[in-house]
UniProtKB/Swiss-Prot annotation:
Family of this protein: Belongs to the peptidase C19 family.
InterPro entries on file: Papain-like_cys_pep_sf, Peptidase_C19_UCH, Ub_carboxyl-term_hydrolase, UBA, Ubiquitinyl_hydrolase, UBP13_Znf-UBP_var, USP_CS, USP_dom
Active site: H806
Organism this protein belongs to: Xenopus tropicalis (Western clawed frog)
Domain USP intervals: 317-844
PANTHER family attached to this UniProt entry: UBIQUITIN CARBOXYL-TERMINAL HYDROLASE (PTHR21646), UBIQUITIN CARBOXYL-TERMINAL HYDROLASE 13 (PTHR21646:SF105)
Protein name: Ubiquitin carboxyl-terminal hydrolase 13
Catalysed reactions, as listed in the record: Thiol-dependent hydrolysis of ester, thioester, amide, peptide and isopeptide bonds formed by the C-terminal Gly of ubiquitin (a 76-residue protein attached to proteins as an intracellular targeting signal)
């Protein structure tokens, strides 16, 4: 028999591999579905690629690759048979254990046991070889099988990729001298004390000075003033502002010339009024000081105490919590309740799977289709077995109905390369939503882009207070952020009385009084959104100098789906993250037509489109800037010998472009730095005229919109060595967003197809107020229409900070509200409309 098996496997020996240290073995989950060894059909692991496939998908992999040898893993769950001592049998595979296969946490391990079975299966005849079979199998096959069975989870390798290099404790930390000069650092509004830069800022831990970093530090430019200050004063340690969290911060030692650990960081920051001690978390991941005062919020959001009826079937599938992953699960539940996302991924599931790359675990569309099908098929959301069948089933083999799906593979792909999302910490759902939209757009080139439904244009009107002249610009956005004006609370007297009782209870060490929450009218939030905003350090092109400025924002277009974020999270003066505990009467029906932008009004005079002079510093890293500005190409051997202002005919967008060029090309291996004599707001992506910055000429913006990149922008990108056609294609494919265009060019091979096609970027969908669009357009579209909406989704947060707590979402389906709380899905009795964090509205007809 041994010779027969050896001869049988001879043709397949070249395709059987032993996993190496860098290989990922997916033996717990199918690449295309949520099948696992516990599924009825078990899981097939390819012995060449080590990818896992359910019974419905293994044939596709065989046909596509010709790979014939798979290891079939099957886990049986049975009632525990106890021995004389009452102990449990271990999980086993014919006398051996499956390693690194987690137990089903939904099964009580005191009542059930696991029996694991493995065998080799040869396709297409499905010839089976039971394992282990050391005597009859060739040595190489035995070694390969052992390596697969003993392999660790691939997600442990993914977690290791996000680990940072181990840092050492600074030799200056224990005896750091701090000057008692009365300096207290506010939680925002920082500037370099020497050049007014507002990014890449470092706080010196000795004297509290705030100065900018060196060139290319933390992905952005600086003038090196923090290092100069150290050379002058000798103060050794600095912390990067914006990196401070409860777990620490980025600390740099100038003397040791490396990033270091400061074990006394909380003490050193407290010297300057930054209190981190109150931010320390407890073992359960919830801040210690948030539990008692927030109990009421947790109960209301999760509808605790109410008899909620479980929901099952298509669209009512829960998602298991991986540990602080509720920010992701709530967003994805809402996303796949939207028809456009359902059609784009689940509707095209067969095509997406058939054309998936050889490693579908790393393909965005495949994993989106997999998740969408898992949530919408109902396969993983089945009601419990009927009571009369339970006894019969338990006598044979228990087959537990799956409760929710495990999104570990999906999360690993979504968070790849992102420090925060790849961690196990709780995150901001709003930040993940924007991160997700960015991934959708990057992976929708040449295909349907379902994120079009969220995109809208914002018109920003900025007025110089001295000259009274104005500038109208437009930018793309996906979220309407509403401020919370606490001063408009309608129950101020109750709040004052509650605060007094709370203080008395604390001093007397009594239980706190019943919580009183500030009641803020939604109309007040909407009014605050429309209020003029002061623009600090506004550079007026009319005055050719800094001046006071004010900015107002309006909608240049209304999206198909409106996402509204309530800006609840902020920092107190003590640097402790705070969540505004408010109740807002969010409407079920919302009409924002009165917020439609009007464009330049009669009698208004526009500011000249001129930017301040650009200063090229005395730095060898400025060679690329010289080549760009001189138009001499990228191969320049000389450098500027002295810093000098260049009065170039650049508008503000070109100045902003240069800064983005500096940021972006660094990660692709270039060195490029430009110092601007004016600070420009880089918080928003650079959107170049075209789809991204359309100038409306009427209330409905009925001007011709063409996604044609400006020639000067194309020329600047070409000067980096990119072919013109490639630059045009990238800009059109990314809505003229330079940051994404550069990333697109490095991740997509040059393609000449469609490079010279010009198409529109607005889809009105039979809207008489919109603009006719070319159906073959490449760039993202603006789906304009009326501004009347109906609420259909709510993401709520329980806790005091986005760094902790828990997210729950409520979605309106089939006329009723449903609560999605991790793997639990139930009919909602009291959706917490007044306590939500992110609200989702869909457009309704007038």
């Amino acid at each position: 028999m041994a010779e027969d098996l050896g001869e049988l496997l001879v043709p397949y020996m070249p395709t059987i591999r032993v996993p190496k240290s860098g290989d990922r073995v997916y033996k717990t989950e199918c690449a295309f579905s949520y099948d696992s060894p516990e599924s009825d059909g078990g899981l097939y692991v390819c012995m060449s690629t080590f990818l896992g496939f359910g019974r419905e998908h293994v044939e596709r992999h065989y046909r596509k690759t010709g790979q014939s040898v798979y290891m079939h893993l099957k886990r049986h769950i049975r009632l525990k048979a106890t021995g004389a001592s009452g102990g449990a049998f271990p999980k086993r595979i014919n006398g051996r254990l499956f390693l690194d296969l987690e137990n089903n946490t939904e099964m009580n391990t005191e009542d059930y046991e696991y029996e694991d079975e493995a065998k080799l299966v040869i396709f297409p005849d499905h010839f089976e070889i039971a394992l282990p079979n050391i005597e009859e199998l060739p040595a190489l096959v035995t070694i390969a099988c052992d390596a697969v069975l003993n392999s660790k989870s691939p997600y442990r390798k993914l977690d290791q990729e996000s680990w940072e290099e181990e840092l050492q404790v600074s030799k200056f930390a224990n005896n750091l001298v701090q000057i008692d000069n009365g300096v207290k650092i506010p939680p925002s509004g920082w500037k370099c004390s020497k050049c007014d830069l507002q990014e890449n800022l470092w706080l010196n831990l000795t004297d509290g000075s705030i100065m900018c970093g060196r060139w290319f530090c933390s992905g952005s430019g600086g003038n090196g003033h923090a290092l100069e200050h150290h050379k002058q004063m000798g103060y050794p340690l600095a912390v990067r502002l914006g990196s401070i969290t409860p777990d620490g911060a980025d600390v740099y030692s100038f003397d040791e010339e490396e990033a270091v650990i400061d074990p006394h960081l909380a003490k050193h920051l407290a010297h300057f009024g930054i209190d981190m001690l109150q931010m320390q978390g407890s073992e359960n991941g919830v801040l210690d000081n948030e539990v008692k005062p927030r109990v009421n919020e947790w109960e209301v959001i999760q509808e605790t105490g109410l008899k909620l009826k479980p929901m099952f079937g298509s669209g009512y599938t829960g998602i298991k919590n991986l540990g602080n992953s509720s920010y992701l699960t709530t967003v994805m539940q809402v996303i796949f309740s939207i028809p456009e996302f359902q059609r784009a991924y689940v509707g095209n599931l067969t095509r997406i799977f058939d054309y998936a790359p050889l490693d579908p675990t790393q393909d965005f569309s495949t994993q989106m289709a997999k998740l969408g099908h898992g949530l919408l098929s109902g396969q993983f959301s089945k009601p419990p077995m009927k009571s009369e069948l339970i006894e019969q089933v338990m006598k044979e083999e228990h087959k537990p109905q799956p409760k929710g799906i495990n999104t570990r593979m999906f999360k690993a792909l979504m968070s790849k390369g992102h420090t925060e999302f790849s961690s196990n910490r709780q995150q901001d759902a709003e930040e993940f939503f924007l991160h997700f939209i960015n991934l959708v757009e990057r992976n929708s080139i040449g295909a349907e882009n379902p994120s079009d439904v969220f995109r809208f244009l914002v018109e920003e009107r900025t007025q110089c207070c001295q000259s009274r002249k104005v500038r109208y610009t437009e930018r793309v956005d996906y979220i309407m952020q509403l401020p919370v004006p606490m001063e408009t609370a309608t129950n101020k007297e109750e709040l004052i009385a509650y605060d007094l009782k709370r203080r008395e209870a604390e001093s007397a060490k009594r239980p706190p009084p019943e919580l009183v929450r500030a009641k803020i009218p939604f109309s007040a939030c909407l009014q605050a959104f429309t209020e003029p905003e002061n623009v600090p350090d506004f550079w007026s092109s009319a005055l050719q100098a800094k001046s006071a400025g004010v900015k107002t924002s309006r909608f240049a277009s209304f999206p198909e789906y409106l996402v509204v974020q309530i800006k609840k999270f902020t920092f107190g003066l003590d640097w402790v993250p705070k969540k505004l505990d408010v109740s807002i009467d969010m409407p079920d029906l919302l009409d924002i037509n009165h917020l439609r932008a009007t464009g330049l009004k009669s009698g208004e005079e526009e500011l000249p489109d001129i930017a301040p002079p650009i200063i090229i510093p005395d730095d060898p890293n400025g060679r690329m800037a010289e080549s760009l500005l001189s138009g001499s190409g990228s191969n320049v051997n000389s450098s500027f010998k002295g810093a000098q202002p260049l009065n170039l005919p650049f508008g503000k967008k070109e100045a902003k472009l240069l800064r983005y060029m500096e940021r972006m090309v660094e990660k692709f291996g270039f060195k490029f730095s430009v110092r601007l004599s004016v600070e420009i707001d880089f918080a928003e992506p650079l959107i170049i005229p075209g789809c991204g910055t359309v100038t409306s000429t009427s209330s409905h913006g009925q001007n011709a919109l063409l996604n044609q990149p400006p020639e000067e922008i194309v020329a600047l990108i070409c000067s980096m060595g990119f072919p013109r056609n490639h630059a045009l294609q990238a800009l059109r494919a990314t809505n003229n967003n330079l940051e994404r265009a550069l990333d697109w060019m490095f991740s997509h091979p040059e393609s000449e197809e469609g490079a010279d096609n010009v198409s529109g970027c607005v889809d009105t969908e039979n809207n008489p107020n919109g603009i006719i669009t070319d159906s073959e357009q490449e760039g993202p579209r603006i789906k304009d229409g009326n501004g009347r909406y109906e609420l259909f989704g709510i993401i709520s947060h329980a806790g005091t900070s986005t760094m902790s707590g828990h997210y729950v979402c409520h979605i309106k389906k089939e006329g009723r509200w449903v609560i999605y709380n991790d793997h639990k899905v139930s009919a909602s009795e009291r959706p917490p409309k007044e306590l939500g964090y992110i609200y989702f509205y869909h457009r309704i007809s007038c």
